[in-house]
Amino acid sequence: MGSVLVDLQIATENIEGLPTEEQIVQWATGAVQPEGNEVEMTVRIVDEAESHELNLTYRGKDRPTNVLSFPFECPDEVELPLLGDLVICRQVVEREAAEQEKPLMAHWAHMVVHGCLHLLGYDHIEDDEAEEMESLETQIMQGLGFDDPYLAEK
């Protein structure tokens, strides 16, 4: 199995309590499970203002969100090992973890896994897509040593 090369960008004032680059690489590799060569992606950890602006610009949602995924798109004849970019909002992840009574690092891992699956083309708009994606997220999270992230909802 290959690995995921992560360009980690920290764009938040408070860096205390953030996951390490090694953790993010481990979680992304667990989600992507690249075969052969490395694949590359960017993970940008931001504050609410940047998340809000990006969510409004690209999704028409007037609020910050936990994770945004921007898959890399290139012509079919061009083969580059680029997955795309994840933008994760520190404050939203921390708030959700507290509200859902989940360990903070487990929720960070879930957001990386969830975002990576979006980069791979998975979605959760339709119920059947959501079930497939949630099932895959659960398998990946358990493979990484975490509990089912949807346990409280079941």
Curated annotation (Swiss-Prot):
One GO cellular component term: cytoplasm
This protein's record includes keyword Isomerase: no
Cofactor(s) listed in the protein's UniProt record: Zn(2+)
Any one Pfam family match given in the protein's UniProt record, by short name: YbeY
Extent of the signal sequence: none
Cofactor annotation comment: Binds 1 zinc ion.
Keyword field: Cytoplasm, Endonuclease, Hydrolase, Metal-binding, Nuclease, Ribosome biogenesis, rRNA processing, Zinc
EC supergroup of this enzyme: hydrolase
Chief place where the protein resides: cytoplasm
Disulfide bonds: none
The organism's place on the tree of life at top rank: Bacteria
Any Gene Ontology biological process: rRNA processing
Listed EC numbers: 3.1.-.-
SUPFAM superfamilies associated with the record: Metalloproteases ('zincins'), catalytic domain
Family annotation (InterPro entries): MetalPrtase_cat_dom_sf_prd (IPR023091), YbeY (IPR002036), YbeY_CS (IPR020549)
Residues at which Zn(2+) binds: 114, 118, 124
One GO MF term attached to the UniProt entry: zinc ion binding
Protein's job: Single strand-specific metallo-endoribonuclease involved in late-stage 70S ribosome quality control and in maturation of the 3' terminus of the 16S rRNA.
Alphabetized NCBIfam families for the sequence: rRNA maturation RNase YbeY
Family: Belongs to the endoribonuclease YbeY family.
Protein name as annotated: Endoribonuclease YbeY
Organism: Haemophilus influenzae (strain PittGG)
Lineage of source species: Bacteria, Pseudomonadati, Pseudomonadota, Gammaproteobacteria, Pasteurellales
Gene: ybeY
